Amino acid sequence: MKHPIHVTSEIGELQTVLLKRPGKELENLTPDYLQQLLFDDIPYLPIVQKEHDYFAQTLRNRGVEVLYLETLAAEALTDKKLREEFVNRILKEGQADANVAHQTLKEYLLSFSNEELIQKIMGGVRKNEIDTSQKTHLYELMEDHYPFYLDPMPNLYFTRDPAATIGEGVTINKMREPARRRESLFIEYIMKYHPRFANHNVPVWLNRDYKFPIEGGDELILNEETVAIGVSARTSAKAIERLAKNLFSRQNKIKKVLAIEIPKCRAFMHLDTVFTMVDYDKFTIHPAIQGPKGNMNIYILEKGLDEETLKITHRTSLMEVLKEVLGLQELVLIPCGGGDVIASAREQWNDGSNTLAIAPGVVVTYDRNYVSNALLREHGIEVIEVLSSELSRGRGGPRCMSMPIVRKDI
């Protein structure tokens, strides 16, 4: 089998993608804990699943192989000791052992089949699921109004963030927010133990044990030699610097890393919520990330004199930097919402800039962003719209919901 991971651009024909079908974790959202679990609203599960299935089928209709995170994770945990190790790490990282006797919860989880185990970990464990007669410690029996022994993981359907593919390797990411930290553990075990990946020594450019956060929504592969990474509310400049050094020393094709600073707020959570590539010479952009004259902070990172030094160049014109690294004379930045102050803010909030390119000039978008979609079509882009009334409540679009595994080179 050829190498299982190959991604050298944002727009090469998508061949294999990783998704996560929304599940029980969304039904474990309650108003009291929305902020803690990073949601603004509670999606209606039957409809959000129908919309996600429609999204997956749309990709299949264009020849894309669709893999599911929950399936790969279950298939990776075939060994009994491995299952136990995985559960121990999930409980430790979820701080579940602070709420209930570790052994009680561990035994409960290990009583399930692999598929059920993964769904239960993702969905969360409510306190009323554990039989009181099985509780052997005083603190387990004390009244506590927090409803979970193990928190649900409702953000998992945004598979873009826990990891990112660069070339034939991955970053397995330390997530900034505690509610999402366990997510990348699934990717770690899949890469190490799933037969599709385990025998290929997949390079890990940056691992989840690195102390500074980085998330896949901030990682964009512009071409074989250039990666753009957002310095954002979720991704640290220190993590970008470490990743750049690792890429330059271990991945000899990457020559430049662009660190693009964006406003650190929830509406502009990741770079891909305000900026995505849709064709060889076209990008969507939310105008609010730039200053009045189109200026913003961009830092070009290149290899220094040795493995631990970098050459860093500060620039302020995104347009000029993109033309330079892509070798283009002309380039188009298509404004989300057509640049209208109301439409752009509304459609960006509903991920109008978060397009998923499945081939050069072919993108998947949410149907609700009709102003942005019309503008993309005016620029010659084929726009494939997917249903979005419930999916969009999670504040992520088609790019957020997908992790490319294989793309054709452009």
Swiss-Prot record:
Pfam families: ADI (PF02274). It is an enzyme of class 3 (hydrolase). GO terms for biological process: arginine catabolic process to ornithine; arginine deiminase pathway. The keyword Cytoplasm applies. Its main location: cytoplasm. InterPro entries: Arg_deiminase. GO terms for cellular component: cytoplasm. Keywords: Arginine metabolism, Cytoplasm, Hydrolase. The active site is at 400 (amidino-cysteine intermediate). It is found in: Cytoplasm. Pathway: Amino-acid degradation; L-arginine degradation via ADI pathway; carbamoyl phosphate from L-arginine: step 1/2. It catalyses: L-arginine + H2O = L-citrulline + NH4(+). Belongs to the arginine deiminase family. This is Arginine deiminase.
